[in-house]
Amino acid sequence: GLIYDRNGELIADNMPTFQLTLTKERVENLDATLAKLDELVGLSDEEIASFKKRMSRRQRPFESVPVLYRLTPEEIARVSVNNYALPGVEIEARLVRHYPNGELMAHALGSVRRINEEDAKTLDSVAYSGTDHLGKLGVEKFYEKQLLGTVGYQQVETDARGRVMKVLDSVPPRPGEDLTLHVDVGLQKAASEALGDRRGTVVALDPATGGILALVSKPSYDPNLFVTGIDYQSYAELRDSGDVPLFNRALQGQYEPGSTLKPFIALTGLMTGTTTPEFTIHDDPGWFKLPNNSRLYRDWNWKKDGRGGHGDVNLQKAIYRSCNVYFFDLAVKLGIDRIHENLALFGFGLNTAIDLPEARSGLLPSRDWKRATRGLPWYPGDTVNIGIGQGDMLVTPLQLATAVATLANRGKTVVPRMLKSGVELPEQAKAKQLDDVEQVPEQFWDLIFESMGMVVHRGNMGFGENGTAWAYIGRNIAYQMAGKSGTAQVVGIPQGEEYDEEELAERHRKHAWFVAFAPIEDPKIALAVLVENGGGGSAVASPVARKILDYYLLESRYKVAQLDD
């Protein structure tokens, strides 16, 4: 079956290629024939060994086996001219999977690859008798059964040499189902271009459906290289690259959420009555201490000379200025049990994705988890760290984007999915749906939305009062965006020392986060952006988010459709 994006653009096609095949029963001397083919098309030892493995897995006599995939016109000509001397050797036309967008869609789509020895042990030999390929990753893997189709057959009468004398019965093959995904190729391109050459990821969802509009992980790779088998050197370069292009950061990367967690902690405080919109702390000079404990938990603007802090801070200012001290204090008052219970409502610590088999669950720590994994009790300092999304908590970018979509929906949960139409969603999709986050007064949602809006739009209010992202993305914006920046620590900074990005090796710098949804009044898109080792989330990740939202809300087919309506 074929795969299309939400606008009908073909993103997984089947392309005709020519393969060199061999039927063992028609070959007098296999090694001599392979030697002759080596002269004509050049067969490596690896290719010959792979062919012999495929030959050993044949299901029936007179079944042709590919020797070489994707013949060039020159190779076809050389074999054709010498065909008289190569009984049992044929050039066969086959359809093979082709990804027209190459590396752009690799991590969103997954890929098909050649069936290997391990695969063959578990596959239905009849169902796969017409193909050498199998969905191995992502959507291609999850919907393999629906995309595969069914093989046809002919019942024939042959002579002693295997030549067909009469066709007794035949059933034509049936193609697999075509799928349409939620993903938008234009938005995918915009997200990829916004990230540029940096390592990172973007996940964007439609809050109304949970449909994944874009899923980018960079660097990427060309999935076409794997369809008919990648050579060892090319694979080794991808496998051993320090930038790990084969790693799907959007689904498998697990990172501290940093300050992107603060709106969820704030809502937990409001839901449980632990804080109020009016409650105010005085943050000066920018650190927090637990009772009977000398350790300083510092705000992000703390300085060694004693400067720092945010002055008087209520919940709204705590979000738009990203005040750590407010959330240290709130987390301790909440306690880990209530934090764990309420964050789980948004899907943290859970894998709720339907059709992305590589997605991971992140980690939402608890007392029980720490006791079971480390044999240690939960300490108050652990709770302090969770208050600003650090410590043991881990999220995947998909998971964080999904939580932001639930926030944008005022508590209506969604299940992230790639499939838009074409086949029925599996039964397990129903089990993935979380209960809605209910019994939250509208004024609490309004307060969180307004506070996240001020992260982006509050500017020109005097020193120290601008939203953390305003200077980077808040000017000349044509819609209302709710956002929150965050940084995830990669290495710890000793007590009493300032974080100096210039002094750190690039791979030790913080990861930059930005989450957002827009328009605030009627959210159409929610997203999470991560730039690995990028530094500050507002400075580095928020411009990426702005470019993506500008494209989707102001330039894309979505915008055209809105105007038509």
Task: Cite the ranges covered by each PLM segment.
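A conserved hydrophobic secondary-structure block that centers on an alpha-helix together
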Residues: M165-G211
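Beta-lactam-recognizing serine transpeptidase/beta-lactamase-like catalytic domain environment
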Residues: A12, T158-L168, P207-T260, F264-A528, ...
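Gram-negative outer-membrane assembly/targeting C-terminal domains
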Residues: Y551-D565
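Second-shell loop/turn segments in exported
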Residues: F18-R26, L34-D38, P61-Y69, R94, ...
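Membrane-proximal periplasmic segments of bacterial cell-envelope enzymes
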Residues: G1-V164, V171-P172, D197-T201, P207-A208, ...
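Solvent-exposed, polar/charged alpha-helical surfaces in well-ordered, non-transmembrane soluble domains
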Residues: F18, D31-A35, E39, Y69, ...
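Short beta-strand segments enriched in hydrophobic/aromatic residues
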Residues: V112, L407-A408, L530-N533
